[in-house]
Regions:
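Short, glycine-rich nucleotide/cofactor-binding loops
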Residues: 4, 8-23, 50-57
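Residues at the starts of beta-strands that form the adenosine-phosphate
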Residues: 7, 37-40, 76
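Histidine-anchored nucleotide/phosphate-binding helix
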Residues: 22-37, 41
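Short amphipathic alpha-helical segments and helix-helix/interface helices
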Residues: 29, 64-68, 106-107
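Anion (oxyanion) recognition and catalysis
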Residues: 33-34, 71, 110-111
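Short, conserved active-site loops that position catalytic residues or coordinate cofactors/metal ions
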Residues: 41-52, 82-83
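A glycine-rich helix N-cap at a beta->alpha junction
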Residues: 57-85
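C-terminal structural segments of small proteins and small subunits
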Residues: 87-119
Length: 119
């Protein structure tokens, strides 16, 4: 691990199984946590579906499982409330540990971060 613990804010904007970017970002997040860095994740646009409960893909690695593991390891995960409303996704459809937020919440995540990564 590096000498200074870093804070990463990761923005996921792609849907769960529309590209590999969400999966790659979740793998990065998990690795960063294992190396004792702090991780914030902001789900925006179609990326909100990465945090949806009851995912059951047959031919892809389950990003929902990755998200659960990352949350259990201490990641701070928030989803854009406006994006959720536009797509008809309610808070009770999100995995436990994911909080609905606004752009103000996203700005706070970015302000505390050493690095912000967009996918």
């Amino acid at each position: 691990m590096s000498e200074k613990r870093k804070i990463f804010t990761i923005v996921i904007g792609d849907g769960a199984y529309t590209s590999e970017r969400p999966y790659t970002m979740l793998r990065f997040a998990y690795t960063a946590i294992l190396e004792e860095h702090k991780v914030n994740i902001f789900l925006v646009e179609d990326g909100i579906f990465v945090g949806k409960k009851n995912q059951d893909p047959t031919t892809y690695d389950n990003v929902g499982k990755w998200m659960k593991d990352i949350i259990s390891e201490g990641a701070n995960v928030k989803a854009c409330g406006v994006c959720m409303k536009a797509r008809g996704l309610s808070e009770d459809e999100l995995l436990d540990g994911i909080k609905k937020t606004t752009m103000n919440g996203f700005v706070e995540m970015c302000e505390e971060a050493d690095n912000v990564l967009f996918s």
